């Protein structure tokens, strides 16, 4: 696993964070050291797939990055009569995802598309995964995507939505942000790395509160919604049709 050193030296003109070649190369290390509970979420996505994915249906991982979620799903399926579709708009991520998926033999077909997730038709879905993806979409586009997902899910289909959250209580918000930064420092990131990455993400990662997510999921049509995992200001929700 290549180590993430992208923000380790001072960057004079710090642009917005993008999932480019340099990020794709170190992404597994970056996300493990940056997102508390990430490996637990990936494991649980497989458990949920075991329970919810049905024969003859399709599974979508929207914003699939290098394919960790897809592999977890595929390992846990009860049937190989399923198609998994992974979508990411980063060509470097897609290339590595395809290579990663192909390194493991399986009879379950997987298609990896380089596209904008807003352009993807969702149909005959028993499971859809948005793992730290929605927060990178413009807020104005989020409800439309979730509505499209709801409509494309089969009855008893599941959406897994993992996000970084904001909190309305200022003191609690500051505490959870500070704990997250402590987590990153404990994983070897310097103050400079934490600061520069935070600045790079400011304009591209627009986070919402748990309440906002729940309200939006209800507007999209979901009625069974639950926060099943949280660590500091990161978490994952499930919504069942």
UniProtKB/Swiss-Prot annotation:
Reactions that this protein is recorded to catalyse: prephenate + S-adenosyl-L-methionine = carboxy-S-adenosyl-L-methionine + 3-phenylpyruvate + H2O
A GO MF label: carboxyl- or carbamoyltransferase activity
Known function: Catalyzes the conversion of S-adenosyl-L-methionine (SAM) to carboxy-S-adenosyl-L-methionine (Cx-SAM).
Keywords on record: S-adenosyl-L-methionine, Transferase
Transmembrane segments: none
Entry binding sites for S-adenosyl-L-methionine: 38, 63-65, 88-89, 116-117, 131, 198
Keyword S-adenosyl-L-methionine on entry: yes
Protein family: Belongs to the class I-like SAM-binding methyltransferase superfamily. Cx-SAM synthase family.
Name recorded for this polypeptide: Carboxy-S-adenosyl-L-methionine synthase
Keyword Transferase: yes
NCBIfam families: carboxy-S-adenosyl-L-methionine synthase CmoA, PRK15451.1
Pfam families, per database record: Methyltransf_25 (PF13649)
SUPFAM superfamilies: S-adenosyl-L-methionine-dependent methyltransferases
Lineage of producing organism: Bacteria, Pseudomonadati, Pseudomonadota, Gammaproteobacteria, Pasteurellales
Enzyme type, top EC level: transferase
PANTHER family the record matches: CARBOXY-S-ADENOSYL-L-METHIONINE SYNTHASE (PTHR43861:SF2), TRANS-ACONITATE 2-METHYLTRANSFERASE-RELATED (PTHR43861)
Subunit and interaction comment: Homodimer.
GO annotation terms (biological process): tRNA wobble uridine modification
Enzyme Commission number(s) of this protein: 2.1.3.-
């Amino acid at each position: 696993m290549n180590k993430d050193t992208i923000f380790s030296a001072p960057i004079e003109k710090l642009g917005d964070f993008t999932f480019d070649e340099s990020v794709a190369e170190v992404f597994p290390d970056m996300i493990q050291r940056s997102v508390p509970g990430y490996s637990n979420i990936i494991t649980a996505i497989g458990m949920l797939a075991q329970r919810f994915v049905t024969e003859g249906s399709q599974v979508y991982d929207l914003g699939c990055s290098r394919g960790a979620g897809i592999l977890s799903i595929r390992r846990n399926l009860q049937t190989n009569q399923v198609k998994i579709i992974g979508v990411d708009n980063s060509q470097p991520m897609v290339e590595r995802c395809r290579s990663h998926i192909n390194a493991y033999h399986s009879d379950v077909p997987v298609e990896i598309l380089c596209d904008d997730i807003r352009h993807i038709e969702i149909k005959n879905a028993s499971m859809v995964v948005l793992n730290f993806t929605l927060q990178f979409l413009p807020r104005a586009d989020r409800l439309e995507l979730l509505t499209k997902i709801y409509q494309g899910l089969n009855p008893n289909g599941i959406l897994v939505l993992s996000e970084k959250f904001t909190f309305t209580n200022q003191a609690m918000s500051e505490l959870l942000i500070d704990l997250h930064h402590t987590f990153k420092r404990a994983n070897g990131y310097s103050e400079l790395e934490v600061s520069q990455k935070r600045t790079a993400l400011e304009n591209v990662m627009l986070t919402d509160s748990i309440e906002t997510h729940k309200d939006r999921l209800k507007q999209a049509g979901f009625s069974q919604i639950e926060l099943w995992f949280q660590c500091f200001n990161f978490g994952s929700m499930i919504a069942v049709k």
